[in-house]
Amino acid sequence: MVEWSIFNEIFAVAFNVLYFVIIIGTIFIVILDNRNPVKTMAWVLVLFFLPIVGLVFYFFFGRSTRKEKLISKKGFTRLIKRPMAEYQAQKAFKCPDEQYQLMRFFRKVNNALPFEGNATEVFTDGYSMLYSLMKEISKAKHHIHLQFYIFEDDPAGRLLRDLLIDKARQGVEVRLLYDDVGCWKVPHAFFDEMRGAGIEARSFLKVRFPLFTSKVNYRNHRKIVVIDGRVAYTGGMNIALRYMKGFPWGIWRDTHIKIEGKAVYGLQTAFLTDWYVVDRTLITSSRYFPEVGIFGKALIQIVTSDPVGEWRDIMQGLLIAISSSRKYFYIQTPYLLPTEPILMALKTAALAGVDVRIMIPARADTWITHLGSLSYLDDIMRAGVRIYLYQKGFLHSKLMVSDDILSTVGSTNMDFRSFEHNFEVNAFMYDPSSALLLKGIFLQDQKDAILLQRKTWIKRPWYQKAQESIVRLLAPLL
């Protein structure tokens, strides 16, 4: 009995020492990673005050992959051979002087090729987007490439799935990428039925316990469809019935665009790069980059960002865009958890006299991110930023427009997760027509929103302020 007691004591001491070494070692690794100090401190606090939970969360969500590469430089050069030839063959296009720096930045760090002669169509509801998408898919002759964060097994998902199966049986190549976490609850049989019909369906960065758990944090949030290399779609909408029907308490308001023209090359490149990541097959045939004519006047640059690149491409581009704005900068985002550079840029622009407006939903789909968003409002309103709370339903739109010349629509939210952890894609449009159209959409939505008054906001209950402040500490981790 005495020997057993001594053994228990020795085991307890050894366990505590090992546990202490692991926690301190993990904190040391976090510090040595030289990340953003705010994010580093958030992880240190979690590991220190909630060691067991913090250790599990760090193992799942905290490890950085910024020094890895998705595709070799040689492979990427082969992939963009045709788009590069088309880009170099363009006559000198006109880019507004104010936006040239932004375009050059994306060209240098993101290999994003700007193309003129594009036409766009904007969708603000799921019904019109899905109808247009299925109409174009029905015309497909050679290939259909689809990529979504969420592809639900519901009436909307099954409707699109059945059409894709029909096209595959007609001999059209169909490739589908879906995010493994975003589609976690979708039955395997749903995608297996597609595979049985000849559709190549792959999940992005599979999460299988206990292996590869660190992949949970790095998700593919992109929404891309490319049909025959001639028409493409991107924006904020996934494939699920709620994107059309909304919630019992309101509509689902989103923004998606259809692109015709050579800018489609950029979305094709993004899809094929991600396809290479999961399938290890590099698809470079010119059939996926056909000759494309002139469809309109829009100058468009497709920009991607990911958690493995050296730079935070889209976030840094937005910093340039905000800093370059002279008259106004309007933003729609479902989640407002900005990084410190973005936060400072917004406040600086407003203090310099730029009309900065941010629209977020009055009611969100997740309470914790909504509390985090609310924690930033007083700070930015004090600098003169106008905050609008959308009342008609859930605002999921990721839209930005500035000075009647620059606009962007895509999958990127104004939060740490989109800027740091997700694979994202946005279409940046240097075009007055596109900017004015999206500005009009923002102003129309403004009629269904209330302008938040700071003098009223600061009087909210102390316990709400406390909740917001606590959640804000975790903002870099959400």
Please place each PLM-identified region on the residue numbering.
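N-terminal localization/anchoring segments of enzymes in phospholipid and broader phosphate metabolism
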Residues: 1-316, 320, 324, 364, ...
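Helical hairpin unit composed of two closely spaced alpha helices linked by a short loop
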Residues: 321, 325-327, 335-357, 361, ...
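Catalytic-core elements of nucleic-acid end-processing and repair enzymes
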Residues: 398
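CN hydrolase (nitrilase-like) catalytic-core segments centered on the catalytic cysteine
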Residues: 372, 384
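Active-site donor-binding acidic/aromatic loop of nucleotide-activated sugar
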Residues: 387-391
